[in-house]
Amino acid sequence: MAALGSLPTLPEGLTYDDVLLIPQRSPVRSRKAVNTSTRLSRNIHLKIPIVASNMDTVCEDKTAVTMAREGGIGILHRFCSIEEQCAMVRKVKRAQSFLIEDPRMILPSATKAEALEELNWSGRKGGVSCLMVVDDFTSRRLCGVLSKSDLIFATDSALVETLMTPVSRTVVSTNTAITLEEAREVMRTKRTSNIPLLGPKGELLYLITQSDILKLTGNRNATLDSRGRLIVGAAIGVKKEDHKRAAALVDAGADVLVVDIAHGHSDLCIDMVKALKVNPLTNKVDIIAGNIATAEAAQDLIDAGADGLKIGVGPGSICITRLVAGSGVPQLSAVMDCARVAKKHGVPCIADGGVKTAGDICKAIAAGADTVMLGNMLAGTDEAPGRVLVKDGKKVKIIRGMAGFGANISKAEREKRLDEDVFNDLVPEGVEGSVPCKGPLAPILKQLVGGLRSGISYCGSHSIADMQQRARFVRMSGAGLRESGSHDISKL
């Protein structure tokens, strides 16, 4: 009876289709002047507030590479083996960097002919402009540098040691923490195109080349780590084996871990966050936790040490948690409640799910989210790993929820634990479907960011932070929602 008696005072839950942002006087003269930079977590900064969802039909290494190059980040799904997920992390890290970890090397006793072969002089893919000359391939002590120009007039039998520029006349560095800007300044002042980075015993650790720096500086939107590599996140669960997975992912180079379960406000998730924050193998990266939908959940995860929060219980296009479990909070209200607590502690929030348009991104961020996580909107792109099918004569890609039957059966198959219990115990909270093939990911991101820039300017703001201070919402009726879209025409 107490529950019945409380019905008149039940809180009201709103989602993106229930509201609009009220336009305000804007000082913005060009959308290009709008700043879309934000934080993913306490220490991870992004150029655009878009995160690729950790779904096995949305984000693997190809999606993550494009996301980082465009200023966002991809979170690699965990529905694979530890080795497979770590391999994806390494692929992202190798995709773009100003620190070459495995530069081509040659011995001083090699001939010009051998050097030409190593340099790939014919210009085939994989060719390099210089070789690092080392005393042997084990100790890797640098003896000098051999460039293509050193070989032009040499005879085929000439030895590398007679042609190379000795290390005593080579610009080198022992600063393994050197930044992109510092490396560029060294090249400018010393007039060199290569900088070998050496260890305490003169051993070759890395190589920085002018061509790699030019590639990186040509794309200023990319989100990079301190070594100039693309940033990437990885999802983990809360089981015992996920402690091993987390350590392996950090070792492989993951910049952030996302503890990702359907009900993030649980002791399992809270305990996992605490364990990761005290484990020396994992506490050097930020930990994001979710999914949650209440202020109480936000506070508990922040108290556990979470560096970021993932908000959303049931709003996704392939999620049926609200139907199966009867639980959830409409997404706009969930974001507002969680963000109100998170802002007090300086912890960024991700609005995960329910986003159908660029306008929804604007509403989520105005409500307090620092980033939005997209699944459906990015599925179907060329980079997305979903399988391509032909449906009614049109190409489509599969998309599926990670709490669904198919995703969990595939995971069990990979882990070689597919037995009758897996089928009997599984209660799906996700479905499978298809989305049209959409082409490359980058143009889609540009359209979404363009819409966000417009939304920020309509709020009379220059940045996300300013928008969150100034934004005002108005509730609208069903008729208002219908009026908001195209109407009274036949679409072409």
Curated annotation (Swiss-Prot):
PANTHER family referenced in this protein's UniProt entry, alphabetically: GMP REDUCTASE, INOSINE-5-MONOPHOSPHATE DEHYDROGENASE RELATED
Keywords recorded for this protein, A-Z: CBS domain, Glycosome, GMP biosynthesis, Metal-binding, NAD, NADP, Oxidoreductase, Peroxisome, Potassium, Purine biosynthesis, Purine metabolism, Repeat
Binding annotation for K(+): G314, G316, C319, R322
Enzymatic reactions: IMP + NH4(+) + NADP(+) = GMP + NADPH + 2 H(+)
Superkingdom of the organism of origin: Eukaryota
Lineage: Eukaryota, Discoba, Euglenozoa, Kinetoplastea, Metakinetoplastina
Protein name: GMP reductase
TM stretches of this protein: none
Function: Catalyzes the irreversible NADPH-dependent deamination of GMP to IMP. It functions in the conversion of nucleobase, nucleoside and nucleotide derivatives of G to A nucleotides, and in maintaining the intracellular balance of A and G nucleotides.
Compartments reported by the entry: Glycosome
Active-site residues annotated for this sequence: C319, T321
Sequence motif Microbody targeting signal, location on chain: 490-492
Assembly notes: Homotetramer.
Gene Ontology BP annotations: GMP biosynthetic process; GTP biosynthetic process; purine nucleobase metabolic process
Keyword Lipid biosynthesis: no
Record-linked InterPro entries: Aldolase_TIM, CBS_dom, CBS_dom_sf, GMPR, IMP_DH, IMP_DH/GMP_Rdtase_CS, IMP_DH_GMPRt
Binding site for GMP: D352, G353, G354, G375, N376, G401, M402, A403
Similarity field: Belongs to the IMPDH/GMPR family. GuaC type 1 subfamily.
Principal location listed in the UniProt entry: other
Binding positions for NADP(+) per the UniProt entry: S30, R31, R78, D260, I261, A262, V313, G314, M402, S454, G455, I456, S457
Source species of the chain: Leishmania donovani
Protein EC: 1.7.1.7
Record Pfam families: CBS, IMPDH
Ways its activity is controlled: Activated by GTP and inhibited by XMP and the IMP analogs allopurinol nucleotide and thiopurinol nucleotide.
The keyword NAD is annotated on this UniProt entry: yes
Record gene name: GMPR
Class of the enzyme per the UniProt entry, highest EC level: oxidoreductase
